[in-house]
C-alpha cells in the first residue's frame, strides 16, 4: 500500500506498510504458531485477509489547529498535530465528509480542544459507515455542553451537504485525559443506530457499542464461526463478551437455545434488535459481566463461545470452564498471547482447529479463531 503520510515520515501507525501482504501474513502465522507451540493443533486453516486499503469503516480523529483551520487526525507524542484526512485506510466515501466538516467546525464555532492549555471544546470527531447502505454516524466529542446550541443551529447546513449522515450525536467528555468518549450521549437526529449487514444478518451499530473496524474480514470471521458451529452437535450455546451479537446471531438456528452476555447496555440493545428482526425467539441477550454470569451458573451448554477484550478471559472463567467442562469452546481473540495463556488454564481441552484473520493489515495485530474440544 502506498501512503504519502508514511513516506513523508508524518505517520508511523502502519509499521508493516513496507512489507507485501503475503509477507505480513507469514509473519503473523509464524507468531501464532510460536505462541501455540506447546499445544498440538489438529488443523491449521489458511489465513483469511481482505483489502489492503480503504477497508476501515471507522475514523477516530483528534481535532486540533484553530477554529478557522481545524486539523483532523492525531497528535504526535510531542503534541504536534497531524492531519490524517488522506489516510489510505479510509474508504473514498470519507473524503467528502472530512472536507465538509472543516468549514462546519468554523461555522458552528467549535473551538478545537488544546491539550497543553486545557482550553477549547471540540476534542474528537468519530465517523462510522455502514457498508450495506452507505449510511453514516457522526459523533462530536465535546468537553462540555457550552457549544451545543451553536452546533444545533449550524447543523442543517451540514445535513444538506451530507445527506448520508443518518445518525449525529454529541458526546460529552469533560475529563482532561486521552479518553475517546464520556458517558453522556446527546442525539441530534431521530435515527439512533446504523444497520450493517454481514452474510444476510442485520447488525446494529449504536454510538457507544463496539463494532469491528474491518467489515470485509469481520464478515468472514462470523461466517467461519457459523460454519464451525453447524458441524457440531449443539442445541444450546453461550456467547460470552458478545458485543452487538455478531457471533451468536450468525451461529443461532431457529431451534437452538442461545444466551448472549455483554456488559455494555448499548451493544445488548443492538443484539436484541437484530434477534427480533431475524425472528429468533430462543435467543436471550443480557447486559451482565460475562465472567460473573457464567460462574454463577450450575450447568453449562454444549458450546461456550468467548470473544474477550485484549486481556483474555482470565483465570476465574478458565477455572470454571475446566470444572464444568462444556464439550466445545470456540475462542475468538484479538490478542493471541492472552489466548495462549488462557488455553494453558484449560488442560482438559485439545485444539481441533485454528484460523488467523488479518483484521489489521500493516500492523502486527491479528484476530484468531480457535476450536477447543474436551478430551
Swiss-Prot record:
PROSITE patterns: SAM_MT_RNA_M5U, TRMA_1, TRMA_2. HAMAP family: 23SrRNA_methyltr_RlmC. Keywords: 4Fe-4S, Iron, Iron-sulfur, Metal-binding, Methyltransferase, rRNA processing, S-adenosyl-L-methionine, Transferase. PANTHER family: RNA M5U METHYLTRANSFERASE, TRNA (URACIL(54)-C(5))-METHYLTRANSFERASE. The active site is at 334 (nucleophile). S-adenosyl-L-methionine binds at residues 212, 241, 262, 307. It holds the Pfam family tRNA_U5-meth_tr. One of its GO terms (molecular function) is 4 iron, 4 sulfur cluster binding. GO terms for biological process: rRNA base methylation. [4Fe-4S] cluster binds at residues 3, 11, 14, 87. The lineage of its organism: Bacteria, Pseudomonadati, Pseudomonadota, Gammaproteobacteria, Enterobacterales. SUPFAM superfamilies: S-adenosyl-L-methionine-dependent methyltransferases. InterPro entries: 23SrRNA_MeTrfase_RlmC, MeTrfase_TrmA_AS, MeTrfase_TrmA_CS, SAM-dependent_MTases_sf, U5_MeTrfase_fam. Its EC number is 2.1.1.189. Catalyzes the formation of 5-methyl-uridine at position 747 (m5U747) in 23S rRNA. Belongs to the class I-like SAM-binding methyltransferase superfamily. RNA M5U methyltransferase family. RlmC subfamily. The keyword Chloroplast does not apply. Gene3D superfamilies: 2.40.50.1070, Vaccinia Virus protein VP39 (3.40.50.150). It is an enzyme of class 2 (transferase). It catalyses: uridine(747) in 23S rRNA + S-adenosyl-L-methionine = 5-methyluridine(747) in 23S rRNA + S-adenosyl-L-homocysteine + H(+). This is 23S rRNA (uracil(747)-C(5))-methyltransferase RlmC.
